[in-house]
Amino acid sequence: YVFHDYEKGLEHAKKENLPVMIDFTGWACVNCRKMEEQVWSDNEVKEILKNEIVIVSLYVDERTKLSEENQYETTLAGKPKKVRTVGDKWMVLQANLYGTNSQPYYVFIDHSGNQLIESANYQDYGTVDKFKDWLIRGLNEFNNI
């Protein structure tokens, strides 16, 4: 299951009793595409992603405008930031919750939004073996709750 909305993905995960992998990504993210093409395409990784978790892919550069009532102002890295687009919303979420704004960035969470294991990125988890191990550890942690 792949969702592009944090709340909807979390709701579905609760209903299906599956963990969530947040995938902070971007349309213009070269390493995101490399990860998808070289790592997610592996048969074992693909099976886990498809059947055992809910993926919430949040595009931090999505330009779709938020409705007026959903736009707001916040602080990002100590500076005022107007949140006007879907991408702005996800960028602020990533920065505020996880202290980073690089992509790809993967976070394994439970139904309450608690992080289950360390987060993953392309630099440290950009191989099939490392990413698969990370997924399995996340699943094991979720199943031990």
Each PLM stretch: what is its role?
Residues Y1-I22, G26-I145:
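Proteins that catalyze or organize thiol-disulfide redox chemistry
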